């Protein structure tokens, strides 16, 4: 028994060696055929002969110059295409089927199956060829005809009805070349040209590397077919075509699947990642994670001014405002910037066209998004709501400012004068100027000083701006923007277009309406007065109210020593009494005024 087993093992090993040797010879023969096919294709393209060297040589191929044989381009193109099909078959084991308009690649097993059942669809092939429908998802519902449907060169319309197809090309043998059955000669030669390397898509300047007929612009290849041979649960094979390289939105054809996916991104507007805190949606998970940091309590603190930021990148950008000197000033409004690029971006606001005007107030905007945000202030529409107290806001910036001022847990910076607390050091510094009277911002035109940069900008625009084109016919006051004029004219007409949805009270401006809703109709007012029991939304409002009971006047004027209960009263006093530059004087009595509107109001007394 042992001898028989040993002999059996020896025989098996011999068969295995013989099989390996046959495979090696077959592989060697395949490589030789590929080399021959490639050299023949080079000859057809260039008309020059190349002789392959043996392995002992330096490598490469010998160039045998010869006479260039002029042949018809169409014949050369056909033969080159067949050579390419043979090379593809040798490399991938796939057979190319070509119709008038489409190139489809099948594996050898699939091709054998189609050849074996050719009689099932031979009658359909004899019909007059019709044009292919654009590629779409095939939903053929009659399972009894699915096999025949699949074999009819995968052609169907959206309703599930079979489409008569043109004859398909038989696979050329690996060792020879036969004439192609489906050629472009059956179509007008001026409309169709086959080029195995490049094809110019209509509407573009550069050729696209696609192998196929240019008469019909939709291409199908191995990568275009999503699942064209997918058996279902019943074992019946259904065919489904998806043209992934043609965009359904703009009907654009792309050469690579990666280019198609990149091109499709702007068309995809689905935002499947939503924030559990505020409900805002995002298109990717990274954007959602960045957004969720704004809800977390952890903030990155600026050591200079105490301002907090959700991300380190925003903190780094903010730090540059402390480090850089602002050398670049705008010639229009005199605002200074630390970078030339920031100045250039700002100057666009003065020069760009603003074709979109608000129907309510006449203010113009450059983009539709800016107009939409502005119109919310006119209509009272509020999309952004606070998850803590439910308060709604017209813009996301207003919501963020509200959350930082009201709901932030830590307010480490407190005022020693009035006890008011702030979340940022910069706000504390700005607040303390109301007590000390420090005004670090001075106007270069008239020398007037201001406590904040926003007040200085407002002063320049109202007093020193030359290009004031909007004039009030009632009081003679000039305005830089039409929206400012419209808002000002309401003081003369008494118009109040903004009404409260709760009590119906009307207001002239949207800011007055918002202040009314916060003070009167908001449900949560945590700060109450111990004297009269009145409730307030903010601690600052409570402190200001308590001064009416105590008579405290912490804000005093450095010029005359007069005291005031609020900083607003102090500012109004300084402007009316101690302002040195009063440009507008009365011709009747010689009295001077700071603003033209005050002079016009004074003229009425004469």
Swiss-Prot record:
Residues 1-31, 240-271 are annotated as: Disordered. Keywords: DNA-binding, Metal-binding, Nucleus, Repeat, Transcription, Transcription regulation, Zinc, Zinc-finger. GO terms for molecular function: DNA-binding transcription factor activity, RNA polymerase II-specific; RNA polymerase II cis-regulatory region sequence-specific DNA binding; zinc ion binding. Residues 242-262 have a biased composition (Basic and acidic residues). A zinc finger (C2H2-type) spans 273-295, 300-322, 328-350, 384-407, 413-435, 441-464, 470-492, 498-521, 527-549, 555-578, 584-606. Gene3D superfamilies: Classic Zinc Finger (3.30.160.60). InterPro entries: Znf_C2H2_sf, Znf_C2H2_type. One of its GO terms (cellular component) is nucleus. It holds the Pfam family zf-C2H2. It is found in: Nucleus. One of its GO terms (biological process) is regulation of transcription by RNA polymerase II. Belongs to the krueppel C2H2-type zinc-finger protein family. May be involved in transcriptional regulation. This is Gastrula zinc finger protein XlCGF66.1.
